[in-house]
Amino acid sequence: MAMMRTSPRDSISNLPDEILGKILSLLPTKVAASTSVLSKRWRNLLGLVDNLCFDESMVVYPNEEEETSGSLRFCDFVDKTFALLSNSHIKKFSLSRVYKYNDDVDGMVRRWIRTVMERGLLEIHLHATPMSFVAIETKLLTSNTLVKLTLSARCFVEVERVFFPALKSLSLFSILGDYTNYIRLIDGCPVLEELYMRDGDYPFLRLTCGTNVESASLKRLVIFTHNPNEMIWHELIYFEAPSLVYLDYSSYVSAKYDVVDFDLLVEARLSLRLWVSTNDYDYSDDDDDDDDDDDDDDDGDYYIVEPKAPIFGDVTELLAAIRNITTLHLSPDSLEVFHFCCKSMPVFNNLLNLSIESNKDKGWQVMPLLLKSCPNLHTLVIKGLVHRVTSRCGDACACIPKKQRKIVQKEEALCCLRTCQVKVLQISEYGGYFQELKQMRHFLGKLECLETVKVGVHAENNNNSEFLRANVLTLPRVSAKCNVHFI
């Protein structure tokens, strides 16, 4: 019997124009425009696109001459696209410039921005690489409809007046502009709810974003600043955001934090870094004598220990301001900052979830005090158990120097883990090394309220997962309710 032949059907072309317009709006505009050559059916659908995304990085030029002429062709394509769209409503406009700055091209960019602003724009995203440049005019910073604005890299902002009455989300990533213009920009967004900032990528410029945040409406704040060469710009950090519920803050530690009203804050993610190494401030003393000097055990020589310079930074007020949170995430550096730069640890009565990340070069000195300051902690999440052994790791850690073991045995009943209310312990990137297994034994043998332990094996040790599992499952558990699961 002859096989029945079926002709392929173009089912997507049978969809209504409105749906095809939505589909094309999800594609890069260059790809969407190329569909016009498919058939007559697709020829006029570009006019239904309400999301324009122009990315010059998608174009690769073989040499500098082609780069110059090619960049102009890219601009010509953008101009023709706007001409085809006529007076169509535009919801979102994204532009990424890559190639060299040119006065004519800069004028075109300003014209494109004005055009989309006049068409009820909801979102605009502008990015310029170090080779290019986008100057933001004052008249471009006024819109009654814009709800989301992103300015990235070499976008230069110099404004006299800003008014975005509907703007809910603002992202500023390493923009060019001084502190005054930054403040004007924030002040011109009366209903702003989300603010994302990155600063410090230009070491020759003063930090503008992230040193001062004042917004009555702000609910979500993400700050990343990185300028390890300019301690002077970290004398004072000021936050006033009474509606804030989420904070993600990454920066070198500052001399002082002035925080006004973080009472509604629920979750904080902190990655604070010290300006100097702490290797000379905390060390392990592994001998069995009663002194704190490792060197004098070898030859009886006498060493004069010079006093250490105080470490720059004070996070006392910052921690006091976030004491009502329920979830806290800490980087390895933050643990050291808490230890060296906090004069008085607040009590986190509402903290239910604590997540920390370990690093073999960073210590756990603050862990005993931190755990004692979280009386109602329910879930403890630790990414990696390997950390730097110091003379002050305390009873939260199994890596106790030999000299202190007798003292620790006498104070066993006072161990911070025995009074800890943690019911869920989650360990990720577990490698099964001797130090890690000791730490697991320490947790399982001291956390009396523990009910669930979740262990995720490091990808490098997947081949030994059964062996690692067996080692952990045989460890003694002080809690009769404790169940161990490998995830």
From Swiss-Prot:
InterPro entries listed in its UniProt record: F-box-like_dom_sf (IPR036047), F-box_AtFBL13-like (IPR053781), F-box_dom (IPR001810), FBD (IPR006566), FBL60-like (IPR055294), LRR_FXL15/At3g58940/PEG3-like (IPR055411)
Keyword Repeat: yes
Keywords, alphabetical: Leucine-rich repeat, Repeat
Keyword set includes Repeat: yes
UniProt-listed Pfam families: F-box, LRR_At5g56370
LRR repeats mapped onto the chain: 71-97, 125-153, 174-199, 225-251, 327-358, 359-384
Domain F-box: 9-57
Identification of the protein by name: F-box/LRR-repeat protein At1g48400
Taxonomic source organism: Arabidopsis thaliana
Lineage, broadest ranks: Eukaryota, Viridiplantae, Streptophyta, Embryophyta, Tracheophyta
